[in-house]
Amino acid sequence: MLDKKKLDVYGPKNNINGINKIVSELNHFNIIGINFEVIEMPGHTLDHIGFYSFNDGSPILFCGDTLFAGGCGRIFEGTYEQMHRALNKISKLPKNTKIYCGHEYTLSNLKFAIEVEPNNEKLKDEYVNVQRLLSFDKPSLPSTLEKELNINPFLRCHIPSVQNKINEKFNTIGDEIEIFTALRKWKDSF
């Protein structure tokens, strides 16, 4: 497709086939009248980036495999600390930000999240809602940052119910990065 049409393909400085517009943190670009800002989000991979737009008061974030509805990406090249920092960066965006992630893993992520926070009513309600949507072949995405802050355990490592569950399961007490690391490793084997 790139051979036939002149398309701009934005991406990090890496040897990724097809990228012809290299961007990094705080770079801006415009596509079809929408201004985007680049946010570096290492963790899943070392050069992972996202595209954020305030979009006239209706903010959107394309975050690839950093944040998923109800979960987050695996750590392939980066570190747990980098991923935790990237998720914290996302959590500071406006609460009405629509989250467009790279995959529809919502239902399995919510099953895990319920294991972590079985008494989280908003989480249980979202699980039922996603089951219903998927039963009608409807996507559960995009999510919103406000929703994720209420249901996503990877954005809730500072919440006592998440900390207590990790401490109970792994007999450890740690800071948020240690909680996040234990949580991500648990999800890897869930």
PLM region descriptions:
Residues N20-E117, E176, K187:
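Catalytic core of the metallo-beta-lactamase
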Residues N88-K98, L107-F190:
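Accessory terminal helices/loops
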Residues D8-K13, I19, N35, G57-S58, ...:
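Homeobox/homeodomain signature
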Residues K4-K5, T66-A69, H158, R184:
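Prokaryotic Sec-type signal peptides and long signal-anchor helices
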Residues M1-E37, P59, D125, N129:
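Active-site HxH/HxHxD metal-binding segment of metal-dependent hydrolases
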